[in-house]
Amino acid sequence: MKSHATRFPKFNKVVNVVPPDKIPTNNITRYHVIDPAGAKNWFMCWIAVDESGTFWVYREWPGVDVGDWAEWRGGKWVPGEGAKGQGYGIRDYIELIQQMEGDEEIFERLIDPRLGAAKYQVQDGSSSIIEDLNEAGMVCIPAPGLDIDDGLQALIGKMSWDTTRPADSVNRPHFYVSSECENIIQALSEYTGDGGLKEAWKDPV
C-alpha cells in the first residue's frame, strides 16, 4: 500500500532499491545512524557514502527478520513487531552492533540528539545514552539538531533527478537502499509526515 501523500514521491523501488552486491565497498565512508528509544527498539541504519556524495543504505536494525516496524491495522499504520522493545540495555546494543559490523571501519556514529542526550538518574548522579555509549567505547556524535523538514528536504534532494530523461552517470539519484533493508524501503514508501512524532514509519526515516 503506497500512501498517496508520501513525502518522497521520487522514491521508486525499481530505481532506488538495489541488490546488496551493488553496494560499493571501496572508496567509501561508512556512517552508523542511531535513533534510540525508551520502551521501543532503537532503530539503526548503516550508510556508505561514495566519492560522488551518493548515499548507499546497506544495513538496518531491526530488519524484518525481527519484525515489520509498522503494520496496517484498522485503516492506519501502527507500530509492528519490529518496534516492540526486546529489553536491550546499552551493553546488548553494543554487542549487537559489533556483531553486525565485524571488521568494518565506521567513520562516524550519529545519534538523535534529543533522546540521546536526555539525562536520566543513575546511582552516582545522572547520565545519558550518549554518555553511556561513549563510556563503553562506542563514541557517538549528536546529529545536527535540524528541523524535521530540513532533514526531509535534504533526503528528497538526494533522490531528485530528471525522470523525463534517461538515467546516466550525471542524471541519476544520489540515494540508494539495499533490498535487504525492507523496513526502510517500506518507510520511504509510506511516510507522510502527517502523523508528527507519533507516525508509525517516522523512525526508519
Positions of PLM-derived features:
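ATPase catalytic-site recognition across NTP-hydrolyzing enzymes
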Residues: 1-36
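A generic signature of intrinsically disordered, low-complexity regions enriched in glycine/proline
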Residues: 8, 16-20, 39, 116, ...
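Short, surface-exposed beta-edge/turn micro-motifs
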Residues: 28-29, 41, 172-174
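Short, flexible loop/turn elements at secondary-structure junctions
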Residues: 35-38, 113
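Short beta-strand scaffold segments in enzyme catalytic cores
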Residues: 42-47
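Short loop/turn segments immediately following beta-strands, especially the blade-tip
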Residues: 49-51
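Mg2+-dependent endonuclease catalytic cores in nucleic-acid-processing enzymes, primarily RNase H-like
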Residues: 53-200
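Short, intrinsically disordered, charge-balanced linker/junction segments flanking boundaries
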Residues: 201-205
